[in-house]
C-alpha cells in the first residue's frame, strides 16, 4: 500500500491534537534511566510556574489558548531516553546507559522491526517508506546491540524516533566500530553513559558566506544530517574516587576508512554544545577533575582484520544453507583475513547443523 502524503496524514490523524499531550505523558511517566535523568516540565506546568503572583489581564489573554508545543519533551523507554525533533523527523539527542550486564543476553534483533514510535504524533513521524530506496540507511542512535539483556529494550531501539538517515558504509563500518568500542568500555568501567544524535553543520561557500543546507528524504521530508555526534561518560564504579572519563566526538555522515583514528574526530564538550545547542550531562559537576577518555583509555577502534573477522563470524549465524555458509568463508579468505579458531569452531558447528537439516528436508521430500 502506498504511503499517505504528509498533508493527508495531517488531516486524517486522530492523534494530531492529542499527540502533543501523549508525548508529554511519556516523557513524564516512563520508567528507565535512573543515574542521570533529563526531565523538562511539561510546557503548561512551566508556564504556570513562571507566572507572577499578580498575573495581568494581558498575560492571561496572551496564553488563553496555550503556547505552541514543539514536542521536544523527554521521552523515556526501557534503556534509553530521547528528545525528538518534530520538524526534521529525527531525534535531537538520545541518551542511554550501558553496563556489562546489559550487553549480554538472549534478545535478538531478528525479532525486531523498524516502526514509527507510538508516542510520536503520526503527523510528525517518519515512516519506513521514507527510507526505502532513498540511498540512506536507518541508523540507530541507541544501538540494538547495547540491549541484549531485554527484548523490550532492544525492540524500542527500532522505533523511528531513534533513527536518522545514515550513510550505509558509515552505519555498518565506522559508526559500528565506535559502538563496539563503547561496549568494550564496560569491561573496564561499570557504568557508561552515551548521548548520540545528528548535526547539520554549516559549510563555507567559495565567496566566504556560510550556509546550512541538508537533503530530505521521503514524503515526510526526513532530514539527512551532515554529521553525527557521540558523547561518552564512563565511571569506574559508583564507589570509585577516580575522576570520570569523558569524550565528545563528531564524525561526518559519510564513509570513513580504517586509517582514521577516533581521536581525530574528538572535539571539546564546549564546542559540541555550541554546535548542537544542547547542554550535555547538566547534573555533572564540571568543577571536579574530569579526565579525557582518550587519555584514560585507548579510544582504539577495531582494525580491518579484527572487524572483518567479527562481521564474518556474525554472518555464520545468518546462513540458511550450506552454499551460503561456504560463501561466508570464501569472502573472508578473499579479503585477505585468515579465520581464527573461534570462527572455525562456529563454522564447523553451523555446517553440521545445516547438513543435517538439508538431509532431513531431502528425506521428507522423497516421502511426499
UniProtKB/Swiss-Prot annotation:
Active site location: 140 (proton acceptor)
Enzyme class: hydrolase
Transit peptide, residue positions per record: 1-41
Note: The active site contains 1 hydrated divalent metal cation that has only 1 direct interaction with the protein; all other interactions are via water molecules.
Family matches, as Pfam families: Endonuclease_NS, Exog_C
Function according to Swiss-Prot or TrEMBL: Endo/exonuclease with nicking activity towards supercoiled DNA, a preference for single-stranded DNA and 5'-3' exonuclease activity.
Protein name: Nuclease EXOG, mitochondrial
EC number(s) on file: 3.1.30.-
Gene name for this UniProt entry: Exog
Cofactor needs: a divalent metal cation
UniProt subunit comment: Homodimer.
Residue stretches in coiled coil: none
Subcellular location: Mitochondrion inner membrane
Family: Belongs to the DNA/RNA non-specific endonuclease family.
Listed GO CC annotations: mitochondrial inner membrane; mitochondrion; protein-containing complex
Gene Ontology MF terms: 5'-3' exonuclease activity; endonuclease activity; metal ion binding; nucleic acid binding
Top-rank lineage group of the source organism: Eukaryota
Keyword Mitochondrion annotated: yes
Main localisation: mitochondrion
Hydrolase in keyword set: yes
Amino acid at each position: 500500500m502506498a504511503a499517505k502524503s504528509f498533508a493527508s496524514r495531517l488531516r486524517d490523524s486522530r492523534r494530531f491534537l492529542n499527540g502533543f499531550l501523549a508525548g508529554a505523558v511519556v516523557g513524564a511517566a516512563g520508567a528507565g534511566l535512573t543515574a542521570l535523568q533529563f526531565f523538562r516540565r511539561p510546557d503548561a506546568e512551566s508556564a504556570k510556574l513562571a507566572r507572577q503572583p499578580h498575573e495581568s489581564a494581558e498575560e492571561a489573554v496572551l496564553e488563553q489558548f496555550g503556547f505552541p508545543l514543539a514536542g521536544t519533551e523527554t521521552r523515556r523507554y526501557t534503556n534509553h531516553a530521547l528528545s525528538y525533533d518534530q520538524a526534521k523527523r529525527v531525534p535531537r539527542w538520545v541518551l542511554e546507559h550501558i553496563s556489562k550486564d546489559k550487553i549480554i543476553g538472549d534478545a535478538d534483533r531478528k525479532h525486531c522491526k523498524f516502526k514509527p514510535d507510538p508516542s510520536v504524533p503520526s503527523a510528525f513521524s517518519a515512516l519506513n517508506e521514507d527510507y526505502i530506496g532513498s540511498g540512506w540507511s536507518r541508523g540507530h542512535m541507541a544501538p540494538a546491540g547495547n540491549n541484549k539483556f531485554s527484548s523490550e529494550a532492544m525492540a524500542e531501539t527500532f522505533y523511528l524516533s531513534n533513527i536518522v538517515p545514515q550513510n550505509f558504509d558509515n552505519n555498518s563500518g565506522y559508526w559500528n566500530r565506535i559502538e563496539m568500542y563503547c561496549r568494550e568500555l564496560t569491561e573496564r568501567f561499570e557504568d557508561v553513559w552515551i548521548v548520540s544524535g545528528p548535526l547539520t553543520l554549516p559549510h563555507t561557500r567559495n565567496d566566504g558566506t556560510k550556509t546550512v543546507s541538508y537533503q530530505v528524504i521521503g514524503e515526510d521530508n526526513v532530514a539527512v544530517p551532515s554529521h553525527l555526534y557521540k558523547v561518552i561518560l564512563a565511571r569506574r564504579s559508583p564507589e570509585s574516587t577516580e575522576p570520570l572519563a569523558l569524550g565528545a566526538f563528531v564524525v561526518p555522515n559519510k564513509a570513513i576508512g580504517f586509517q582514521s583514528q577516533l581521536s581525530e574526530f574528538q572535539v571539546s564538550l564546549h564546542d559540541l554544545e555550541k554546535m548542537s545547542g544542547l547542554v550535555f550531562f547538566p547534573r555533572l559537576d564540571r568543577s571536579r577533575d574530569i579526565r579525557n577518555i582518550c587519555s584514560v583509555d585507548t579510544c582504539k577502534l577495531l582494525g580491518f582484520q579484527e572487524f572483518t573477522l567479527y562481521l564474518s563470524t556474525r554472518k555464520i549465524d545468518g546462513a540458511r544453507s550450506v552454499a551460503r555458509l561456504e560463501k561466508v568463508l570464501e569472502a573472508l579468505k578473499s579479503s585477505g583475513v585468515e579465520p581464527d579458531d573461534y570462527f572455525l569452531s562456529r563454522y564447523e558447528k553451523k555446517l553440521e547443523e545445516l547438513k543435517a537439516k538439508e538431509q532431513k528436508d531431502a528425506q521428507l521430500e522423497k516421502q511426499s
